[in-house]
Structure formats: C-alpha cells, structure tokens
C-alpha cells in the first residue's frame, strides 16, 4: 500500500478526526462511566457477572460515551474555538462537517444498540431514557443553570440498566447507587467546568461552576460528601462485608486532596483534579469486588 497516496492520506485524516471527535484518545470519560456500571454489575451478580453481559456493557459504554462526545462537539461547534481547552477540536479547526458528525453519532448509537441484543427487555426499555439523556445533555448548557446535574443522570443510567440486565428488576440499592453517582458526577464535572470558567463566562455558556460562583468549591465538596454518605447507606442496605468499609477513609483522603488542590482554582490543576477521580472509581470497585468475595 502506498502510504503517501491521496486516498490513504484522506482516510488517515478522517480517522484522526473521528478518533478525536469520539475522544478515543482520552479514555477518562469512558472510565468514569464504566466504574459505576461495574459497581452495579458486581453487586447485582454477587461478584460473578455473566461474561456476555459484562462485554455488552463494556462495549456499549465505550460506544455511547463516544456518541455523546461527538454530539457534544456538534452542539458546541460555535463556542469551542473561544475556549482555550477546546480550541483545537475538529469543529473549531473546520475539519469536520455537521452532517458528518451527525452520521457518526447515529452510527455509534446503532452499534451500541446491537450490544443490547443479548440483554432482556427491561434493559432495552431502560436504554431509551439513557439514550435521550446522553444525546440531549450538550444542549442543556444553553438554558439549564446546572447542566452537570443532567450529565449526572445520563452518566448514572448504566446502574439501573445493569441491575435490570442481571436480575430483571431494579431494587432499592440500585437507586441509592444511582443517586450517589449523580452527586459524584456533579462533583467531578464541576471541577472540570472550573477549568473553563473564565471562557464560559465570556461566551455565555451555563455550567455549575458559573452558577455556583464563589461557592463552587463548597458545592463540589458537599457533593463529594453526599456521594460518600450514600455509599455508606448502600453498604448498610446490602449488609456489606468489612472490606467494603475500608474504601470510605481512602476516598475521604482522596477527596480532601482534591479540595486542597482546587483551592487554587488554577486551570491546569482543576483539570488534573478532575482526572484524579478515576482513583475514586477504582477504589470503590475494589471495595465492592472485595465485598462480594468475602460475603460468600
């Protein structure tokens, strides 16, 4: 194959654009979606999730996160060029057309729908509000003062879907975990929004960081605290083994470190603090994994 041929160069360019639109080169969003989904799968299956179900949720999560990123860039195409962090995205650079992005979104959603085939009808039904939330979230930044809460709903729907897929029902512990994850998402995405706060104020985009104003850090920590409290409530409801409870002091320490970091409100530090939430995700997964092991 001639690597310098016009066709190859064209295909290589489009592949690069699609990878960047999907954020396939930045897995943090997929991880933050996967952790709560895995928490739910392990709890619902008593630590032994069916491999087909696990694969369906893992692949489906990646595809829907990718679709969400593409439609987000489509929605923000007139603003990204004015924001320091997003000025090099494909739309901001004029490298992608609107129709192209919409077709890519539809294709990714279709692939994600195929992941539902081995799952039950209740899971299919619950995928509809999940799809609606994922595709409409980017547009809430025009009118909703706390779009990060809406994102929290979208990022949490994998939890009841996981319980539905495993047990064909959505018990109370699923909704406790759902509420906890909404608060966690609101916390870390507000930190993410703090990194863009100055730019968002200039262009008129609504975010929780803008809405909370000088109380943004207090709001973040209240959400973190509520998240941890609900995880403790969840532990009490499920009769968690001792290993589950070891996560709480570790997570509290990680949350305190985040507080110490974001007090500076420095753009890069806020972004790095957002990334650090991956640690909280895997700590809770390890705790739930250990709980299901020792509870047997």
Swiss-Prot record:
Entry's family note: Belongs to the UbiA prenyltransferase family.
Recorded GO MF terms: 4-hydroxybenzoate polyprenyltransferase activity
Subcellular location(s) of the protein: Cell inner membrane
Biological processes, Gene Ontology terms: ubiquinone biosynthetic process
Function according to Swiss-Prot or TrEMBL: Catalyzes the prenylation of para-hydroxybenzoate (PHB) with an all-trans polyprenyl group. Mediates the second step in the final reaction sequence of ubiquinone-8 (UQ-8) biosynthesis, which is the condensation of the polyisoprenoid side chain with PHB, generating the first membrane-bound Q intermediate 3-octaprenyl-4-hydroxybenzoate.
InterPro entries: HB_polyprenyltransferase-like, Prenyltransferase, UbiA_prenyltransferase, UbiA_prenylTrfase_CS, UbiA_sf
Designated name of the protein: 4-hydroxybenzoate octaprenyltransferase
Entry annotated with the keyword Magnesium: yes
Keywords (A to Z) from UniProt: Cell inner membrane, Cell membrane, Magnesium, Membrane, Transferase, Transmembrane, Transmembrane helix, Ubiquinone biosynthesis
PROSITE patterns xrefs: UBIA
A GO CC annotation given for this chain: plasma membrane
Origin superkingdom: Bacteria
EC number: 2.5.1.39
TM region positions: 28-48, 51-71, 102-122, 143-163, 174-194, 212-232, 233-253, 274-294
Topological relation to the membrane, as annotated: Multi-pass membrane protein
Alphabetized NCBIfam families for the sequence: ubiA_proteo
Required cofactor names: Mg(2+)
Catalysed transformations (reactions): all-trans-octaprenyl diphosphate + 4-hydroxybenzoate = 4-hydroxy-3-(all-trans-octaprenyl)benzoate + diphosphate
Pathway of action: Cofactor biosynthesis; ubiquinone biosynthesis
Organism for this UniProt entry: Neisseria gonorrhoeae (strain NCCP11945)
């Amino acid at each position: 194959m001639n690597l310098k041929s016009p066709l190859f160069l064209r295909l290589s360019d489009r592949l690069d654009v699609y990878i960047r639109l999907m954020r396939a080169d930045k897995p943090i969003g997929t991880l933050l979606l996967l952790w709560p989904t895995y928490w739910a799968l392990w709890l619902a299956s008593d630590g032994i999730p069916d491999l087909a179900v696990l694969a369906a949720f893992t692949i489906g999560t990646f595809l829907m996160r990718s679709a969400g990123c593409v439609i987000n860039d489509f929605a923000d195409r007139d603003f990204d060029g004015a924001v320091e962090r997003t000025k090099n995205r494909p739309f901001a650079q004029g490298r992608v057309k609107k129709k192209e992005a919409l077709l890519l979104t539809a294709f990714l959603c279709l692939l994600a729908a195929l992941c539902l085939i081995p799952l039950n009808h209740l899971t299919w039904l619950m995928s509809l509000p999940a799809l609606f939330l994922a595709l409409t979230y980017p547009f809430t930044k025009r009118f909703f003062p706390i779009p990060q809460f809406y994102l929290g709903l979208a990022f949490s729907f994998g939890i009841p879907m996981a319980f539905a897929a495993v047990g064909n029902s959505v018990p109370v512990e699923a909704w406790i975990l759902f509420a906890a994850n909404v608060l966690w998402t609101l916390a870390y995405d507000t930190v993410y929004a703090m990194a863009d706060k100055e730019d968002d104020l200039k262009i008129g985009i609504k975010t929780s960081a803008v809405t909370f104003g000088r109380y943004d850090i207090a709001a973040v920590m209240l959400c973190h605290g509520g998240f941890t409290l609900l995880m403790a409530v969840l532990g009490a409801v499920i009769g968690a083994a001792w290993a589950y409870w070891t996560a709480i002091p570790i997570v509290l320490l990680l949350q305190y470190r985040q507080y110490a970091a974001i007090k500076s409100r420095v753009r890069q530090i806020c972004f790095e603090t957002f990334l650090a939430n991956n640690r909280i995700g895997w700590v809770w997964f390890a705790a739930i994994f250990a709980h299901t092991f020792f509870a047997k």
